[in-house]
């Protein structure tokens, strides 16, 4: 490999059992399934902490969250902590970050300012996306109900715009060494995606885990507070888990990733490609939703696939 080229693709809130290649045939994820067939699929990959900012702080600094001020979503990295973009840029590697950042101490969407070490021409955090929208469009972009009321086009979504920038970067930097991050917010809520994706799961019931019947007895106080709004006190045996928007967005981001993989094959066929997610989602297991201060398998076990070493296999060892 004459040039050093690495493409790091990350999603948000994507469980391992939401990918076909991890043993869930009902999930329509052909792009990532293809990547798994061409690389190494890690069976026991775990996040350092199952919350967005802490998980990302570990990935992009190489430090544990408690060592770089990555304790919670509202924290920014310590001033004395260098991210991988800074370190690689100092070594002459063109580093670009496209997508959700969540490490600047701002709100969920970021500050819209390029972080140290990355190419400002390609910086595109979620604040940058919101600045492109009208006030009405901003509201629609954060409401799950928008998908029922309006014809959401692919071009309107954050995922599509991240993909377009990634493809542009790959085409224009085909002859250079680079480190490209493509960080999708999807399939994190509000699960915005075109109808053709969420309608694929209309009426589909996600497998019912036995631990969805757990009670809150003997659980710590924070667990009970977390479960307060979602705890199904009655008739939980009859509860049907039908997250069509979540699963639809899961297939949508796979579709967008597929376009990046195709561009990589054309413009950077020798690139190392790494794919993972920051954490999973409880999906009512243990009476909980989303993610948070717990170490349950549903939120700590993450997908991890690496292509670029001429190997096609699964790795059974624990990694993080």
PLM regions: where:
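Short glycine- and hydrophobic/aromatic-rich loop-to-beta-strand nucleating segment
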Residues: 57-60, 304-306
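Catalytic-site neighborhoods of secreted/periplasmic enzymes
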Residues: 58-155
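Generic structural signal for helix capping and beta-alpha/helix-loop junctions
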Residues: 52, 104-105, 283
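Membrane-proximal lumenal/periplasmic loop motifs of glycosylation machinery
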Residues: 45-51, 71-76, 216
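Generic enzyme active-site microenvironment
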Residues: 10, 98, 276
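Short, hydrophobic/glycine-enriched beta-strand segments
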Residues: 5-11
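Short, structured active-site-proximal loop/turn typified by the sulfatase FGly-forming signature C/S-X-P-X-R
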Residues: 4, 20-56, 62-63, 92-96, ...
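Active-site-proximal cap/lid insertion segments
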Residues: 2, 13-26, 126-161, 169-320
């Amino acid at each position: 490999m004459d040039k050093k080229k690495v493409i790091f693709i990350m999603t948000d809130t994507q469980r391992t059992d939401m990918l076909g290649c991890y043993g869930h045939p009902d999930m329509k994820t052909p792009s990532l399934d293809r990547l798994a067939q061409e690389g190494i699929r890690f069976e026991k990959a775990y996040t350092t902490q199952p919350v967005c900012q802490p998980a990302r702080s570990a990935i992009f600094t190489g430090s544990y969250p408690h060592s770089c001020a990555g304790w919670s979503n509202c924290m920014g990295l310590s001033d004395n902590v260098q991210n991988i973009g800074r370190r690689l840029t100092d070594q002459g590697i063109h580093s670009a970050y496209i997508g959700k950042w969540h490490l600047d101490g701002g709100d969920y969407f970021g500050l819209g300012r390029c972080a140290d070490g990355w190419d400002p021409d390609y910086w595109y955090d979620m604040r940058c996306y919101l600045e492109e929208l009208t006030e009405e469009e901003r509201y629609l972009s954060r409401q799950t109900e928008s998908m029922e009321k309006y014809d959401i086009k692919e071009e309107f979504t954050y995922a599509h715009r991240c993909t377009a920038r990634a493809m542009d970067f790959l085409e224009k930097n085909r002859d250079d060494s680079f480190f490209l991050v493509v960080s999708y917010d999807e399939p994190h809520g509000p699960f915005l995606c075109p109808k053709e994706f969420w309608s694929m799961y209309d009426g589909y019931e996600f497998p019912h885990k036995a631990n969805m019947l757990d009670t809150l007895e003997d659980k710590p106080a924070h667990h009970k507070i977390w479960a307060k709004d979602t705890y199904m006190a009655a008739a939980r045996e009859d509860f049907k888990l039908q997250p069509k928007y979540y699963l639809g967005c899961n297939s949508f981001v796979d579709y967008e990733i597929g376009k990046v993989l195709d561009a990589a094959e054309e413009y950077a066929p020798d690139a190392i490609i790494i794919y993972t997610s920051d954490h999973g989602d409880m999906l009512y297991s243990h009476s909980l939703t989303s993610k948070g201060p717990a170490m349950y398998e549903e939120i700590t076990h993450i997908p991890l696939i690496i292509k670029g070493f001429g190997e096609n296999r699964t790795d059974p060892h624990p990694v993080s």
